[in-house]
Regions:
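Alpha/beta-hydrolase
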Residues: 137-216
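Cap/lid segment of the alpha/beta-hydrolase catalytic domain
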Residues: 61-77
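Catalytic active-site module of serine/aspartate enzymes centered on a nucleophile-bearing elbow/loop
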Residues: 251-280
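Short beta-strand/loop motif that positions the catalytic acidic residue
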Residues: 221, 227-229, 233
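Conserved acidic catalytic loop of the alpha/beta-hydrolase fold
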Residues: 77-95
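Conserved HGGG/HGGXW glycine-rich cap/lid loop of the alpha/beta-hydrolase fold
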Residues: 12-66
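Conserved alpha/beta-hydrolase "acid-adjacent" motif
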Residues: 234-240
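Conserved hydrolase catalytic core segment
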Residues: 93-135
Length: 280
């Protein structure tokens, strides 16, 4: 995996990952990481990516890993950062794949970048905060409620929450915990404090971005879109996936009974195969 630092005109740096620099014969798939994670593409999918002809691209969102923080960032502004990344790499069109909050960033990018996006696959994506008809907090675990309600009260309140010493309990299901004993135990190498060497700005700004206007219209997504969600997800409950499916013109929803926030990734490889099928 090639890693580079992309210097932007505003002085910020984005830390970028590319599995096959300059290989235009592969389908570029941009990975959008979860909260809080590094942006390195998912190792558990590398083998499948090889036989599917995938070129993995990723980047640490601002405030994570080697990327400069950008307080006040939105889904749309991160989509603009993605544009700078793919332009710098010489990539014209590409597919998007995102997990958890990263799924929402993938959807935002698809809305902003339009025809450059060939397909989108998300796993446990979160719906917009102003989603009409959705009880946004319903079904969330207590730690998630506290964290996101702090973000909804403003960035200063979110900073106080994250620096108060409060512990986050994800309340993973048995199916989720079993995933850590297999290939997706990889998440432990990129999540949590490992993704925030310079402090919690990435986490703070992710959560704040979920509860403000996204700056893009999801109805403008033209790429075929796969939404995967587990019915037992207490971090981002499955009604978020249902709402997205009902409001995205090109979306297909796969609901998985009994799966939670991590265990839904058991279907990530089939999601990658779906992307390949959509793009030819």
């Amino acid at each position: 995996m090639d890693e580079t630092d992309l210097r932007l005109a505003d002085g910020r740096t984005l830390h970028v990952y590319d599995s096959a620099p300059g290989d235009d014969g592969r389908l570029a798939v941009v990975w959008h990481h979860g909260t809080p994670n590094l942006g390195v593409p998912p190792e558990p999918l590398f083998e499948a990516g090889e036989w599917l002809g995938i070129r993995w691209i990723g980047f640490d969102r601002p405030g994570y890993g080697g990327s400069t923080a950008a307080p006040g960032r939105t889904m749309a502004s991160v989509a603009a950062d993605l544009t700078r990344v793919v332009d710098a790499l010489g990539v014209g069109s590409f597919a998007l794949m995102g997990y958890s909050g990263g799924g929402s960033y993938a959807l935002g990018a698809a809305a902003v970048l339009g025809e450059r996006v060939e397909a989108v696959a998300t796993f446990a994506a979160i719906a917009p905060y102003d989603a009409d008809g959705l009880d946004w907090y319903d079904g969330m675990i207590p730690s998630g409620l506290a964290s996101l309600r702090a973000a909804a009260a403003g960035r200063d309140a979110k900073v106080r929450h994250e620096t108060s010493g409060v512990e986050y309990d994800p309340e993973f299901t048995a199916a989720d915990l079993a995933m850590f004993d297999g290939p997706w135990g990889w998440l432990g190498s990129v999540a949590g404090d490992k993704s925030m060497p310079n402090g919690p700005d990435g986490l703070i700004d992710d959560d704040c971005s979920y509860v403000v206007p996204w700056g893009c219209d999801l109805a403008k997504i033209t790429a075929p879109t796969l939404l995967a969600h587990g019915t037992d997800d207490g971090i981002i409950p499955s009604p978020h996936g249902q709402w997205l499916a009902d409001h995205l013109p090109t979306a297909k929803l796969d609901l998985y009974p009994g799966l939670g926030h991590v265990s839904v990734l058991a279907h990530a490889e089939s999601g990658l195969e779906w992307i390949r099928e959509q793009t030819g």
